[in-house]
């Protein structure tokens, strides 16, 4: 009897082998489109089926004790995984010294190898899978990373870098961001008006100074009895500001003036002044004067009753 067919089954596909002049049946195939990294054992098992003309069949595969090691097809891919740091943002400002760093680790073929994770803060020690505060959540296409920084970072510039490889050893391009940590709130002081000021002028002058490590990014708002006084310009060098209250927003009697400053990280400071507007002149309601003649050099008395 002679051999009728020799076939190979790889990843569910059947391929015929061709008899060569040297007596070997040969398959010159193309590896599967995806990496074998996620297959059991990390390879595609190859099943060989030999059939003779009488219909007798012999089958061996990767589990064969003699030839199994020759029937393990390892396929690898060469596309780099990607890393995206989602928080903090590059050039951003945050108001906590213990931020929760988040990132997306993605690879659409062999898959992210979490054991290769390399997270560093300010070029410090390598933070890897299993570190306290580090959570890797498996999602479609990779992992979502979350890292709760356990020890307070200093205020100022902070650099965060993340690297990772896939299961075929392809390393992602290095990714890093630089952000600014600012946890000290801005300050504000008023030189005008004085607390408790009593005035007959509705156009009250409001002036003061605010301080912050990034004055050009602060937002300052002024309200009079809850009415916004419009945009306020802050000197980017000195922090000084000045404006005049809208007279229409001042009321007779007690008035509340609030000045609030908010920096780029959302930290804020506020100061309040109470000003009394009194535009009503006093009323003279009674005069008890001198009705008799008074000798020169002699004392006299005039009594006035005044209301306000």
Region annotations inferred by a language model:
Residues 21-33, 137-147, 236-244:
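Aromatic sugar-binding surface patches on proteins
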Residues 57-70, 171-177, 267-272:
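Extracellular and select intracellular beta-sandwich modules with Ser/Thr-enriched
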Residues 1-3, 107-114, 211-218, 308:
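Extracellular acidic loop/turn motifs
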Residues 14-21, 128-136, 229-236:
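Short, surface-exposed loop motifs enriched in S/T, G, D/E and P with embedded aromatic residues
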């Amino acid at each position: 009897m002679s051999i009728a067919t020799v076939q190979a089954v790889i990843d569910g596909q059947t391929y015929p082998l061709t008899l060569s002049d040297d007596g070997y049946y040969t398959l010159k195939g193309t590896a599967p489109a995806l990496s074998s990294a996620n297959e059991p054992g990390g390879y595609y098992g190859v099943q060989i089926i030999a059939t003779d003309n009488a219909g007798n069949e012999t089958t061996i595969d990767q589990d064969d004790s003699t030839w199994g090691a020759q029937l393990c097809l390892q396929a690898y891919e060469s596309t780099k995984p990607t890393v995206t740091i989602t928080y903090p943002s590059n050039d951003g400002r945050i108001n906590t010294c213990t931020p929760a760093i988040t990132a997306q680790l993605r690879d659409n073929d062999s898959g992210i190898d979490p054991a290769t994770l390399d997270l560093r803060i300010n070029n410090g020690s390598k933070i890897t899978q299993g570190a306290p505060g580090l959570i890797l959540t498996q999602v479609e296409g990779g992992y979502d990373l979350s890292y709760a920084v356990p020890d307070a970072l200093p205020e100022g510039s902070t650099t965060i870098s993340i690297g990772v490889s896939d299961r075929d050893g392809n390393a992602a391009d290095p990714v890093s961001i630089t952000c600014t940590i600012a946890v000290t709130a801005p300050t504000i002081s008023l030189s005008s008006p004085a607390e408790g000021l009593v005035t007959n002028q509705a156009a009250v002058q409001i002036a003061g100074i605010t301080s912050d490590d990034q004055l050009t990014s602060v937002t300052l708002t002024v309200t009079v009895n809850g009415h916004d006084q419009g945009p306020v310009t802050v000197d980017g060098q000195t922090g000084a500001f000045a404006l005049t209250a809208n007279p229409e927003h001042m009321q007779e009697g007690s008035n509340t003036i609030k000045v609030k400053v908010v920096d780029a990280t959302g930290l804020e400071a506020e100061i309040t002044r109470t000003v009394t507007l009194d535009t009503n002149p006093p009323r003279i309601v009674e005069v008890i004067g001198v009705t008799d003649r008074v000798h020169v050099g002699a004392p006299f008395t005039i009594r006035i009753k005044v209301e306000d």
